[in-house]
Amino acid sequence: MGLQAPFRSGGGTSRPQGRAAPRAVDLRREVHDAARRARVASRVLALLPAVAKDQALRSAADAIAGHAELILSANAEDLETARAAGTPSAMLDRLALDTKRVEGIAAGLRQVAGLPDPVGEVLRGYTLPNGLQLRQQRVPLGVVGMIYEGRPNVTVDAFGLALKSGNAVLLRGSSSATRSNQALVQVLRASLVSEDLPADAVQLLSADDRATVTHLIQARGLVDVVIPRGGANLINAVVRDAQVPTIETGVGNCHVYVHEGADLEVAERVLLNSKTRRPSVCNAAETLLVDAAIAEEALPRLVTALQDAGVTVHGGFARDATEDDLRREYLSMDIAVAVVDGVDAAIAHINEYGTGHTEAIVTTNMAAAQRFTDGVDAAAVMVNASTAFTDGEQFGFGAEIGISTQKLHARGPMGLPELTSTKWIAWGDGQTRPA
């Protein structure tokens, strides 16, 4: 597969100093034109049989693996620029690719190819008394916009899930990953062409200008849904300004509540895994709640375990956690600690400070566990298990495009079914509706 210079979808050139070129108009046109091309491509994908989509995904996986050198070279340039800008180490880790990570990206596409095709799945069907046969089945959403930060792997994950579910995807990544994303999309587009599929099923929008985001999220009628994936500022801005339907994902102020009926050995294990396994992801625990009835015994043990693991504790022994501590999504080796007076107080605290992502209770009291699971408002609730399990692959349905913290159209880890809508189909033999 011959590849040219990295693909760019507009916005990659700077305008000369002192000339008032209508860049804003041009950028809006570029985004809208890309969306129109995506719409055309989406109609092709919507009619593809599962076998063709799976072959295209396997071809893309082979192309990613076969062009690892190109991808890693582009990523090295991004990393060099990021280091020179003083980017924190945690963000550098999100940005970085190596041979193993590229292999993992390719493996992810092959995994998606092996998943059941959601398109055409019949959710319900029945025959009316007049003989009219009704069925409701899954259909693609159409054109999906993805806005995300930092992680080049999201570029390929979004492509794979969109293709499998029959959708075209418009990608707007972070400027910090521009070269990496260009290289990846270049490879993906070439692989689509090699399978006689439209390259415009995946397009990378310019990350050089923040106005790209505005034009994408306001392209009502051209884009069917936008999924922002990143920090709170990004997600809040998209949800606030969008005219296109959005699915809010990712912000996770997750809690581990240690009930008075907890086995403290289990509590320590669950807490440490929830906090330290990958502290920079949205399902990491950010607050520890300890029941007042066992605080004298449990707090020293749990706080010491956290500190021994390298976690900075905000609250606990020396002082109460502040309001800012309790509302913060740290995404680092930090955690807030507070004492609550029983399960109802824990529920009230979480419903006040949580973000509707993942909450956990540790207890041997099943009545308390049931009250907690019923009362907490979250996409996922864990009983005696780590918050880290909120993940599409861990839940057993494969890759995810994000974790929705809203209640419409999807909630929790979003896999292939969540990238579909539904269509009602009626089969008749001449039925008419009475006056």
Swiss-Prot record:
Keyword Oxidoreductase attached: yes
GO biological process, one term: L-proline biosynthetic process
Keywords assigned: Amino-acid biosynthesis, Cytoplasm, NADP, Oxidoreductase, Proline biosynthesis
Catalytic activity: L-glutamate 5-semialdehyde + phosphate + NADP(+) = L-glutamyl 5-phosphate + NADPH + H(+)
GO molecular function: glutamate-5-semialdehyde dehydrogenase activity; NADP binding
InterPro entries: Ald_DH/histidinol_DH (IPR016161), Ald_DH_C (IPR016163), Ald_DH_N (IPR016162), Aldehyde_DH_dom (IPR015590), G-glutamylP_reductase_CS (IPR020593), Glu-5-SA_DH (IPR012134), GPR_dom (IPR000965)
Region: Disordered, residue numbers: 1-24
Cystine crosslinks: none
Domain of life of the source: Bacteria
Entry's EC annotation: 1.2.1.41
EC main group: oxidoreductase
Family of this protein: Belongs to the gamma-glutamyl phosphate reductase family.
Record's function text: Catalyzes the NADPH-dependent reduction of L-glutamate 5-phosphate into L-glutamate 5-semialdehyde and phosphate. The product spontaneously undergoes cyclization to form 1-pyrroline-5-carboxylate.
Name of this chain's protein: Gamma-glutamyl phosphate reductase
Organism: Mycolicibacterium paratuberculosis (strain ATCC BAA-968 / K-10)
Gene: proA
